[in-house]
């Protein structure tokens, strides 16, 4: 299928959680549709994030791999500033970052809960806070949050219940914008 009908020529995108799996796929898809794309992730040691940025560059698009901790307001601010510096603007934010602990809720400790909510909920919120004013000022832009059908109903796998809870929060936050 040709993506020409979905051309994003001239658009600038930031994919949070773009190192592998769905995030990588979305980043490459945006680039295939002619968008310039910055990818970010917390983990960069394995070289996978840079590899995604290199693939995007090989498509003739501007790209960069930027390490960021989206649970930190300062890190998010620096990420957005660097993205705008590299791309010359920002039209699309795609929040794909995810982390989960495969534990039933009664077995999840406070540190695990904090890690889960810091990435999957607080991180998305901080990204919204940093990007929404930019998009409002330019009177255009799109924020796309990856949730999960698991966030719409109770998860059959009790070890995934904690993930379902934060993804329900992401779905509701998205509806509020």
Region locations from a protein language model:
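Canonical Rossmann dinucleotide-binding motif of NAD(H)/NADP(H)-dependent dehydrogenases/reductases
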Residues: 8-38
């Amino acid at each position: 299928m040709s993506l020409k009908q979905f051309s994003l020529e001239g658009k600038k995108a930031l994919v949070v959680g773009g190192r592998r799996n769905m995030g990588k796929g979305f980043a490459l898809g945006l680039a295939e549709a002619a968008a310039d794309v910055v990818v970010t992730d917390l983990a960069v040691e394995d070289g996978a994030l840079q590899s995604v940025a290199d693939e995007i560059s090989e498509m003739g698009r501007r790209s960069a791999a930027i390490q960021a901790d989206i649970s930190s307001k300062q890190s998010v601010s620096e990420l957005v500033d660097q993205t705008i510096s590299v791309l010359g603007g920002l039209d699309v934010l795609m929040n794909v970052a995810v982390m989960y602990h495969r534990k039933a809720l009664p077995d999840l400790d406070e540190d695990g809960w904090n890690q889960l909510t810091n990435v999957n909920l607080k991180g998305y919120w901080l990204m919204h806070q940093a990007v929404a004013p930019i998009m409002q000022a330019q009177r255009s832009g799109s924020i796309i949050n990856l949730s999960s059908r698991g966030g719409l109903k109770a998860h059959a796998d009790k070890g995934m219940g904690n993930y379902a809870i934060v993804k329900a929060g992401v779905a509701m936050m998205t509806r509020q914008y």
